[in-house]
Amino acid sequence: MKFDSILSTIGQTPHVRVSRLFPDHDVWIKSERANPGGSIKDRIGLAMIEDAERSGALLPGGTIVEPTSGNTGIGLAMVAAVKGYKLILVMPESMSVERRRLMLAYGASFDLTPREKGMKGAIERALEIVASTPGAWMPQQFENPANIDVHVRTTGPEILADFADKPIDAIITGVGTGGHITGVAQFLKPHWPNLKVYAVEPTLSPVISGGAPSPQPSAKEGPNLGAVTTVLVGNVPVMAGLWTTQLADEVAKSGG
């Protein structure tokens, strides 16, 4: 396969069966790590920037400013590098150094906020930067409709195409902004009315199920902001961070 741009390789990620770990069930993982930036957030990074270009909110030579806890920043940094935009990422100082190094490799700059203020503090600081920077634009991933729309246009149809011969019974996914689970559910529910959609969130920050957001990210970073989109979910299991980490280790050891 030949592509004119790395951005053309975003999406169309494979589905991989994890049969050794779940021998009695037909369980598949949609491997979003196959995106060039390593996560599903590449989709929204490209979608939000291109939507802003079409609307005129982001002009050539402009500056992108976004509060992010990690993967969205990587996606935005990759897209900004290809398209020639300056990118300022605002995040709590507690966020992963490894992720920061990757964003830096794409040419992004950082503004780190106090750990105790969490993502709310990062959002407040990002708004200050936008207000004082000519030509600046803030994607606002927690509120941007393009965050949901890209999953209606791409992720949902990809799932439907791969499982057209055998409808899925349930989709289980973690939740950050809510854009992924909302968009996928909106697209798939009309095709598969009996589909159950489950959002999984950490015990330290059970926002969707009615709990309080954590003031600090957990050791295994997860959502800590109470600004998640209303989603089309059937249930919201709350999982302990240690258990989910152990399960991820088992999946890696048994199926790669």
Model-derived features with residue positions:
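PLP-dependent amino-acid enzyme catalytic core
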Residues: 1-235, 242, 246, 253-254
